[in-house]
Amino acid sequence: YSQVKKEKEQGCYEDFIECLKLYDKEENGTMMLAELQHALLALGESLDDEQVETLFADCMDPEDDEGFIPYSQFIQRLMSDPVVFD
C-alpha cells in the first residue's frame, strides 16, 4: 500500500510525458534545454539555479546538433534514480 501511495503522489511516467508534450513545439519528443527547464519549473517544485544544474547534469542526455534534448529519457532517468537535494 505504501509503495502505491508513494507512486501516486509522485505521478507516473506517462503523466510527466503528457505534461511535457504541451511544451513540445515540434511534437517530436525533444525540447531545447531552456524550454525543458522552463517547463519543469512551471510544472514542478521551485528549484534554484544550482539545483537545476545538478538535476540536468545527473539526468540529461547531450543535446543533438540542433540543440534539442529527448525528454523521455530524461524523465526515465529522473524517475529511476531521483536526485536528492540537501
From Swiss-Prot:
GO cellular component, one term: muscle myosin complex
Gene behind the chain: Mlc1
Keywords for this protein: Motor protein, Muscle protein, Myosin, Repeat
Subunit structure: Myosin is a hexamer of 2 heavy chains and 4 light chains.
Gene Ontology molecular function: calcium ion binding
Gene3D superfamilies: EF-hand
UniProt cross-references to InterPro entries, sorted A to Z: CALM/Myosin/TropC-like, EF-hand-dom_pair, EF_hand_dom
Pfam families: EF-hand_7
Ranges where the EF-hand domain occurs: 11-46
Name under which the protein is recorded: Myosin light chain alkali
Species: Drosophila subobscura
SUPFAM superfamilies assigned: EF-hand
